Design a protein with these regions (language model features):
Chain A
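A generic structural signal for short beta-strands and their flanking turns/coil linkers
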Residues: 18, 26, 37, 78-82, ...
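Hydrophobic beta-strand-centered segment that forms part of the acyl-chain substrate-binding groove
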Residues: 48-102
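HotDog/MaoC-like acyl-thioester-processing domains
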Residues: 1-15, 89-138
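Catalytic strand-loop segment that frames the active site of acyl-thioester-processing enzymes
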Residues: 1-55
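Short, intrinsically disordered, mixed-charge
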Residues: 32-36, 71-75, 121
Length: 138, 145
């Protein structure tokens, strides 16, 4: 069930798991949209020639996935801040899972903090971050 | 703190070294939101009364240069992360101005040697001068041992 107000948030709760579309098609379209059309984001073979294990999902697309996940959980949430660390490449066409956990709830000002992780099928963390989110007071 | 890091902080922190204007096309922000997996109408429907760019859209905007002129090259730079702070919505169809400064410089030493981090911050303002948002880019430079 979607979260509407701060009163519905429970400290320590897990956000519903989000499976982002990390296909090469999406990564490639995104890279071209933001002007990063090089092979490392658009072509597995070209990326391998650059020494990468395959084409990558752009880091800021991963950040966008994290925010989309929060909006799926709480559609009226306003992102006040999000900080992400790109620990290792997210390889396109590999399945990744995003998880999030509420690490702080302030019912007075309506803000929550959420720790977020993008992991691959081996359970390896590729991207992690923290978001501060404003929710309606109700 | 290492002497060279302290000197770099004294010389470079908190001084604007770039200014650039950015148009915010609605079709681009909508496509950005769609590819990220957003489903909320305020990001996807230009007729929505609160139509706005997705919060991390500004992370895709780059200034004319990432580091100040004469900034020391501690090693090969790699993208280590991004941060965004949102104060007011960025409205598609407007033009915004980004001013860049170095927000932080610090180092960490691990088993493979010293890594120097530089955080470039772009502050975005609308035409009325309202501070809309900040976008931080964290670059890590690994020194050759």
């Amino acid at each position: 069930m979607a979260i509407s107000t701060i009163q519905e948030v429970v400290f320590g709760e897990d956000l519903p798991t989000f499976i982002p579309d990390t296909s090469l098609a999406i990564a490639s379209q995104f890279a071209k949209l933001v002007g990063w059309g090089g092979p490392r984001f658009t072509d597995h073979e070209g990326a391998r020639k650059e020494g990468l294990p395959g084409a990558m999902v752009p880091g800021i697309l991963n950040q966008g996935y994290l925010v989309a996940m929060i909006h799926h959980w709480a559609p009226d949430a306003e992102i006040k801040a999000i900080d992400t660390v790109f620990r290792a490449p997210v390889i396109a066409d590999e399945k990744h899972t995003i998880s999030g956990v509420v690490t702080d709830v302030n019912e007075e000002d309506g803000q929550v903090e959420i720790d977020l992780t993008v992991a691959n099928e081996k359970g390896e963390t590729r991207v992690f971050g923290t978001a501060t989110v404003q929710l309606p007071l109700g | 703190m290492d002497q060279d890091i302290a000197e770099a902080r004294d010389q470079f922190l908190n001084q604007d070294f770039d200014e650039k204007t950015f148009e915010i096309p609605a079709d681009k922000t909508i496509e950005y939101a769609r590819l990220c997996g957003e489903t909320a109408a305020r990001f996807l429907d230009s007729a929505h009364p609160d139509f706005q760019a997705p919060p991390t859209f500004i992370a895709s905007l780059s200034g004319s240069r990432a580091l100040p002129e004469n900034f020391p090259r501690f090693g090969l730079g790699m993208d280590a992360g991004k941060g965004v702070e949102c104060f007011l919505p960025v409205r598609p169809g407007t033009t915004i101005t980004g001013r860049t400064h170095l927000h932080d410089i610090y180092s960490k030493t691990g088993r493979s040697g010293r890594m120097v981090f530089a955080v470039s911050r772009i502050e975005f303002f609308d035409a009325a001068g309202q501070h809309l948002a900040n976008a931080d880019s964290r670059v890590v430079m690994r020194e050759k041992s």
